[in-house]
Amino acid sequence: SHEIRTPLNAIVGFSEIMAVTEDEEEKHEYLEIIQKNSNLLLQLINDILDLSRIESGKSEMHFQQVEISGLIDEVEKVHQLKMKSNVELKVIRPAEEFWTSTDRNRVMQVLFNFLSNAIKNTESGVITLGLKHEGDWLKIFVSDTGCGIPEDKLPRIFTRFEKLNDFVQGTGLGLSICKSIVERLGGRIEVSSELGQGSTFALYLPYQ
């Protein structure tokens, strides 16, 4: 409830202040705060609904044959434009095609979350999107040279409302949703991180 009340209180509070403020510059500043918290609240509600549907089994996984190398290229094209000026996005993948039965849209949702976190937490350096074939698994990973995750937080990052760090705004539900999705796909997520050095999030999909 705290996660919902915080942006809601900001919206109500600054709306009341804005109603009695005559200075146009101050009004604009308050409006930006209201919009920011409104977007956060909307994202939070959407994430809660998505997580609830996935965990209850009401959100179906649509399995089909998916070519993962091409999917990686598609994800890369979408995110190249989102890179900060001091950050390079690199792709490392084999030349050959890898087909497997999975839910294409859900895999992309997980990778979008990994990359979104990497972009938020990396001010300069390199973000790497990669694909490796490891036996019965396809490993898709996102590595960054960002701020990293404190060691005491690593065991809790998939807990609901747990944020990767205290510097970046978010709902704290993205990784919980990713974990639920990947488990439904028959896969797993592995994370390694070092504070001040960066993080790697790896999605393992069964290779059939």
Task: Name each model feature, range by range.
Residues K36-L41:
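Short alpha-helical segment of the dimerization/phosphotransfer core of two-component systems
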Residues G13, I149-F161:
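Short conserved segment of the HATPase_c
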Residues A19-E25:
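Short acidic helix/loop segment immediately C-terminal to the autophosphorylated histidine
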Residues H62-E67, K84-F98:
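Conserved catalytic submotifs in the C-terminal HATPase_c
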Residues G174, C178:
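Short alpha-helical Gxxx[C/S/T] motif in the catalytic ATP-binding
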